[in-house]
Regions:
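Active-site loop/oxyanion-hole signature of alpha/beta-hydrolase fold enzymes
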Residues: 7, 16, 49-94
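Conserved alpha/beta-hydrolase catalytic His-Asp/Glu region
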Residues: 126-129, 146-156
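Conserved HGGG/HGGXW glycine-rich cap/lid loop of the alpha/beta-hydrolase fold
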Residues: 9-60
Length: 156
């Protein structure tokens, strides 16, 4: 799997197809494999880029000082778009990735041509109140993993 070094740390990503760029943004506690049934169907006409974002199921720890808040992850996605030198991107966000994609579109609109939101968090319900304790715990765990560079993952 290709990797790219960004100011926040190293991000793994998959890339398939050629054509106008589409970047897929997954939600919390999943990784880019969420899009495995989607991207092969689009790859004939589109360049599909699927990063593994630091939202709980990534395999490479971020730098200890990386901002892993939603706004920080949105900056990371913006930095990824810049590093890949893509413009007029179709940004597709699911779940928490939809909320992050909205932030990317606001802050990096010069690179985003279209925004597709699928079953996602948005507006005043991000994160949903029931998930606030889990999200705060997950961010704390991610920080600990980054500091020790050991995310405590097993297998795969």
């Amino acid at each position: 799997m290709p990797q790219i070094t960004l100011p926040q740390g190293t991000v793994r990503y998959e890339e398939i197809g050629a054509g106008p760029p589409v970047v897929f943004v997954h939600g919390i506690l999943v990784d880019g494999t969420l899009w495995d049934l989607v991207t092969p169907r689009l790859a004939g006409d589109l360049r599909c880029v699927v990063p593994d974002l630091p939202l709980g199921s990534h395999r490479v720890a971020m730098n200890a000082d990386a901002d892993l808040s939603p706004a920080g992850v949105a900056r990371l996605v913006g930095d990824l778009l810049a590093a890949l030198d893509v413009e007029d991107v179709t940004l597709v966000g699911n779940d928490t990735g939809g909320a992050i994609s909205q932030l990317v579109a606001l802050d990096h609109g010069e690179r985003v041509g279209r925004l597709v939101l699928t079953n996602c968090d948005c507006f005043e319900v991000f994160p949903p109140k029931e998930f606030v304790p889990m999200v705060l715990h997950q961010v704390a765990e991610l920080r600990l993993g980054a500091e020790g560079q050991d995310l405590g993952r097993r297998g795969r």
